[in-house]
Amino acid sequence: MRQFRKIIGAFLVIAITLCTIASCDLLGGKKPEELTATADEILATTPYTVEMLLKYDANDADMLTAMSDVAATEMKLTVDGSNFVGKLALGEENYIIYTFVDGTLYTEWSENGTDVQEKKEITAEDKAGLLAEFGTGLKYTDFSEVEVASAKDVSVITCRNINSDKVAELAAPLQAQLEEVFDDVVVTVYNATLDIELENDSYNVIVLTCEYFITVNGSTSYSVEMTYSMKYSYGKDREIMAPSF
């Protein structure tokens, strides 16, 4: 029983860590603010936005290459809730302006004096992937089976069968915590399900369910299911549900 209590304590530490990640102000939601910084600095403070910029520039490979050179890149970014405007300067004649409003990414850029405009719809699956990545460390592409159910106001994405290359990564935080308590412990994740609910672009619910198999001192084994739940609104408060197991 003492060993089991120590294991549960380690789970709570992991849950608090995930809750801290989920409660971070990813979009500067407290109030609209303007930032002028290098891309790597912005990456550290607004990862959701920068990931959107890097992922959804769908046209110019050279432009993407320049964007990835964070040491030479500067951005000016205005964030307001889930909407943002970003301008990326690449020399005197080349620039990109992104405007992300209500699920649509508008892109305008100038390349050697030629102005180009386009817009791209961001799908529920795309949003879910980014939300999941910053809420739990996983993306929907980390699963081999993905189901999307959409109604008028709600989209629900269910991800099953986690890819084998992510199993060790998912088990690592708990493994590290338990190694501080036990000399000989092995943690294995044999099942994980990620459920993401998006409603009216107003709030999101992310639920990660993990089934762990834990072996202590080579003999005593435990099978534990842990559920991490988090709910938050764009630009508003984040609500973290109590972890359950």
Residue ranges and their predicted role:
Residues 153-245:
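Gly/Pro-enriched, hydrophobic low-complexity segments
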Residues 111-177:
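Flexible, processing/modification-adjacent segments and terminal tails
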